Amino acid sequence: MALADRLLAAWYAGHPALALLRPLEALYRRVVTRKRARFLSGESASYRAPVPVIVVGNITIGGTGKTPMILWLIEHCRRQGLKVGVVSRGYGAEPPRLPWRVEAIQSAEQAGDEPLLIVQRTGVPLMIDPDRSRAVQALLASEPLDLILCDDGMQHYRLARDLELVLIDAARGLGNGRCLPAGPLREPAERLQEVDAVLFNGASADRPEGFAFHLQPSALVNLRTGERRALDFFPAGQRLHAVAGIGNPQRFFNTLLGLNWQPVPHPFADHAQFSAQSLAFSPSLPLVMTEKDAVKCRAFAADDWWYLAVEALPTPAFCGWFDSQLQRLLPGHRTP
């Protein structure tokens, strides 16, 4: 197990050695708290876009289902007749220049895996740049939009936001509740009291402190042909290789178990790069991976490689709340 994976496991399971990192945690907390205070006071300048900006992110290290939720938000806003754009850091991307407009035909190396997935799924205009405010300005200069979704960027205070949605893995919660490097928190837990909504991935019902949503498997999609198959394509008990290079691989493996398959788990680091050699497993079995990983593997995929398409399903209470926020942010807009 890599050092990063061991540290992640310790943050969520607890380990006495983490106490040694508390002096560094105290320093980290002071830095992030002062940074936020400077922007709130106006001491540090932030850019406010001429259209509403909704930040979708988390305060923890590790997967929370952010990309499926962004896909849901895009489609939901479109059903309201809104023109939506997305900005993202583009983690791991190596574009020719910044900001960079992501197109569906680009490679994951150039565009980043999550931005490419979003564009291939939705065709939404999407700009990547670690400087999210610059990405927003470039996106708005390229075409008229009603609304901007910021993929992650909770801690990027240079971009002013009108709504903050924070996602949390309901099973793992906030881990040991401590900030980096003694725990998984990017910001102190008190930050949750300031956001507009908290969504718990995998919660069985809404809570007083936030809304529930879950990820629903919808189909198997062949990497080479794009063919979609129902989830009963594999019989119960089917053994298969399971590949997940995401923030919480075990959630993906548990999903496959819940479909009554027998996955042989192959966890990789989040945003890992793949090759035919790194995925040449024995024995020979069908291979199922996440959609985020699939965008990096189509060029060398075998005939029996599939990805599991999933959809985010928030509760009716969240849908109603979110629609009320859209009406507040865009009072002149009429739903078709």
Curated annotation (Swiss-Prot):
Its EC number is 2.7.1.130. The keyword Transmembrane does not apply. GO terms for cellular component: plasma membrane. It comes from the Bacteria. Keywords: ATP-binding, Kinase, Lipid A biosynthesis, Lipid biosynthesis, Lipid metabolism, Nucleotide-binding, Transferase. ATP binds at T60, I61, G62, G63, T64, G65, K66, T67. One of its GO terms (molecular function) is tetraacyldisaccharide 4'-kinase activity. SUPFAM superfamilies: P-loop containing nucleoside triphosphate hydrolases (SSF52540). Pathway: Glycolipid biosynthesis; lipid IV(A) biosynthesis; lipid IV(A) from (3R)-3-hydroxytetradecanoyl-[acyl-carrier-protein] and UDP-N-acetyl-alpha-D-glucosamine: step 6/6. Pfam families: LpxK. GO terms for biological process: lipid A biosynthetic process; lipopolysaccharide core region biosynthetic process. It is an enzyme of class 2 (transferase). Belongs to the LpxK family. Transfers the gamma-phosphate of ATP to the 4'-position of a tetraacyldisaccharide 1-phosphate intermediate (termed DS-1-P) to form tetraacyldisaccharide 1,4'-bis-phosphate (lipid IVA). This is Tetraacyldisaccharide 4'-kinase. It comes from Pseudomonas putida (strain W619). The gene is lpxK.
